[in-house]
Amino acid sequence: MCLRYLDIPGINDDTDYLKIVNKYGDTIYRKPHFRALEELGVSAKFIQTADSDDVKKQIDLGLPVVAGILHHGAVSDPSGGGHFVVITGYGRDYWLVQDPYGELDLVNGGWAATGAVAGRNIRYSFKNLNPRFFVGGEGSGWCWYDFKRVK
């Protein structure tokens, strides 16, 4: 999603990107992503201390943010190995999210609907997404941000 935003040649969906990442290792680790981005001529930063203001600042600059979330379990006690979504906007009380896997059931965990179309332009309330993103409270979010072309 972020690479399409930058109009990187040969990247039409996350499948194209994952083929490159898989050359360098498991997708759950940062290093293969950094190496894949480098191959594609893109730089990005990864932090584990993001808060809502950090995300909003990137969005206000016109840059999407890839947010790590826990997608299993109830919103009151999220769990799971993790999943990443792309935040492309926000409103007074929601994040605008893109997810090629589908639409999340934020209250109960899991998926409300699967498929790329199901995950387009979903408005997730701060109330229900933030506990899955900022699991340890504000300032504990894992995200990729500041995507730039370097070639």
Question: Where are the model-predicted features located?
Answer:
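Active-site-adjacent substructure of cysteine-protease-like catalytic cores
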Residues: 47-107
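Sec/Tat-exported extracytoplasmic proteins
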Residues: 2-7, 38-41, 59, 63, ...
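Cysteine-nucleophile protease catalytic domains, especially the papain-like/related folds used
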Residues: 1-47, 138-148
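Generic structural signal for short, flexible, solvent-exposed coil/loop and linker residues
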Residues: 26, 31-35, 44, 54-56, ...
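Alpha-helix initiation/capping motif
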Residues: 29-32, 51, 70-72, 125
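Noncatalytic regulatory segments and standalone regulatory/sensor domains
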Residues: 24, 60, 78, 90-151
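Extracytoplasmic/secreted proteins, especially bacterial periplasmic and envelope-associated proteins
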Residues: 1, 32-39, 54, 82, ...
